[in-house]
Regions:
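Periplasmic-binding protein-like
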Residues: 2-10, 87-125, 144-156
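Extracytoplasmic
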Residues: 3-5, 22-24, 34, 69, ...
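Beta->alpha turn/N-cap motifs
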Residues: 12, 30-33, 59-60, 76-83, ...
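Short helix-initiation/N-cap motifs at beta->coil->alpha
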Residues: 14-15, 54-65, 103
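Immediate post-signal peptide segment of exported/extracytoplasmic ligand-binding proteins
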Residues: 15-26, 152-156
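Extended ligand-binding regions for polar small-molecule ligands
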Residues: 20, 25-26, 31-34, 107-145
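Ligand-binding cleft/hinge of the Venus flytrap
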Residues: 35-57, 86-90
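A ligand-binding cleft/hinge motif common to bilobed small-molecule-binding domains
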Residues: 38-41, 66-101
Length: 156
């Protein structure tokens, strides 16, 4: 139904402008997160360079502290978490245009169960997209609808 994006955040005055610019840099992530996997296992080495150090913390608060105190050059996490963090200090931070990772989201039920509920949920979500409700919700929370909906972008 929707896309979920993992993004990279840097200081507003950072010289890091693209994922390629992360080569050799220090990056903080939350342990066991998708960004941790991307930086440590590098499933797409042509898109995501080898960084200098990956610091894995148990909470996003620790990740935020690492960049606030200049211990790292960048942090990575879910777009919503990055945007919420930015609200505390407008103008101090920016999110890179390139997504670190884009995942399609949906709702799943065990096979052979909840067919009626599944059909009802699908119908309601489709109606919400048609009448603009979903777009309004996405915009209310500071996201770009063109990057959020399956079939409408989200590939950056």
């Amino acid at each position: 139904y929707l896309y979920s994006r993992q993004m990279v955040l840097v200081r507003a005055d950072s010289d890091i402008a693209t994922l390629a610019d992360l080569a050799g840099k220090r990056v903080a992530v939350q342990a066991t997160s998708k960004p941790e996997t991307v930086f440590l296992e590098r499933p797409e080495p042509e898109r995501v360079p080898k960084v200098g150090e990956v610091y894995c913390f148990s909470s996003m608060e620790e990740v935020y502290s690492a960049i606030r105190k200049d211990f790292v050059d960048a942090i990575a996490g879910h777009e919503g978490a990055m945007r919420t963090f930015m609200e505390d200090s407008p103008g101090s931070w920016r999110i890179l245009d390139q997504s670190l990772l884009v995942s399609g989201l949906g709702v799943a039920f065990p096979k052979g169960t909840n067919e009626i509920l599944s059909a009802q949920l699908t119908a309601v979500l489709q109606e919400m997209q048609k009448d603009g409700t979903t777009k309004a919700i996405v915009e209310k929370y500071g996201f770009d609808p063109d990057q959020f909906f399956l079939g409408r972008g989200g590939s950056s």
